[in-house]
């Protein structure tokens, strides 16, 4: 575990080129090192909203899962600046999968390429007895325009298989039905099948360019239609 954080003036070492992402507790910047001119991504996590232990868990999960060719590289440096915990990651020049998919999807060939790589990354994570829990288009970064290199990122939600956690505001289209049914702040057990469910949503979107439903709940007509199809197939198997 990291015992302390070096206080630095981030502007002395980096030029912040642009803000490329922002969440409720963090910001992500494209930056250029003033000396080497290397481009990196800096993730800045608000220290008033996240504890040092929570930040360390995300950083250690990120750096511990590399090297794998389809896991985003995190560099071996952490620091603190202006009320933020920060670490540096490699830069994905083509952005995330969301910005690379048309309204018609990726097509079968590119979908196969993406899914083979993301599947390999998830298999690696699961082999460590861990679950990602946030597999979505925004967390798959594109490094080559023909999709021969994509990488899974954002390991802030990584937990050990079987851990008991509190339900927060999971992104509904990616949330399995058993979690949709739970109330906010209710406890549930982490399982790798949640990653598999989310991965399935990614595959669907890559092929068709749309989400299968807004939420995995019987009140959603698209999910209701899926359940009817699934139940019909199950009865035939019997």
Put a short name on every predicted segment.
Residues 141-174, 184:
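Activation segment/activation loop of eukaryotic-type protein kinase catalytic domains
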Residues 27-32, 36-47:
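Glycine-rich ATP phosphate-binding loop
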Residues 126-143:
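Catalytic-loop of the protein kinase fold
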Residues 73-85:
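Short beta-strand micro-motifs within the conserved protein kinase catalytic domain, predominantly
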Residues 97-106:
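AlphaC helix of the protein kinase catalytic domain
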Residues 114-115:
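Activation segment signature within eukaryotic-like protein kinase domains
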Residues 82-96:
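Conserved short submotifs of the Hanks-type protein kinase catalytic core
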Residues 44-66:
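The N-lobe alphaC helix and its flanking beta3-alphaC-beta4 segment of protein kinase-like domains
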């Amino acid at each position: 575990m990291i015992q302390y954080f070096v206080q630095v003036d981030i502007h002395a070492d980096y030029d912040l080129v642009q803000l490329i992402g922002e969440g409720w507790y963090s910001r992500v910047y494209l930056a250029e090192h003033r000396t080497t001119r290397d481009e990196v991504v800096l993730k800045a996590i608000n220290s008033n909203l996240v504890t040092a232990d929570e930040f360390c868990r995300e950083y250690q999960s990120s750096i511990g899962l590399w090297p794998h060719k389809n896991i985003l590289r995190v560099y071996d440096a952490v620091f603190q600046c202006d009320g933020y915990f920060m670490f540096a990651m490699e830069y994905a020049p083509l952005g995330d999968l969301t910005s690379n998919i048309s309204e018609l999807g990726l097509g079968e060939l590119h979908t196969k390429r993406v899914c083979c790589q993301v599947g390999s990354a998830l298999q690696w994570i699961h082999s460590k007895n861990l679950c990602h829990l946030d597999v979505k288009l925004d967390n798959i970064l594109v490094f080559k325009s023909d999709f021969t290199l994509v990488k899974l990122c954002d390991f802030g939600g990584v937990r050990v298989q079987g851990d008991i956690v509190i339900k927060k505001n999971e992104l509904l289209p990616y949330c399995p039905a058993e979690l949709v049914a739970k109330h906010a702040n209710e406890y549930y057990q982490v399982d790798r099948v949640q990653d598999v469910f989310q991965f399935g949503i990614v595959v669907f979107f890559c092929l068709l360019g749309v989400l299968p439903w807004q939420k995995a709940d019987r009140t959603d007509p698209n999910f209701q239609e899926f359940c009817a199809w699934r139940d019909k197939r199950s009865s035939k198997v019997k």
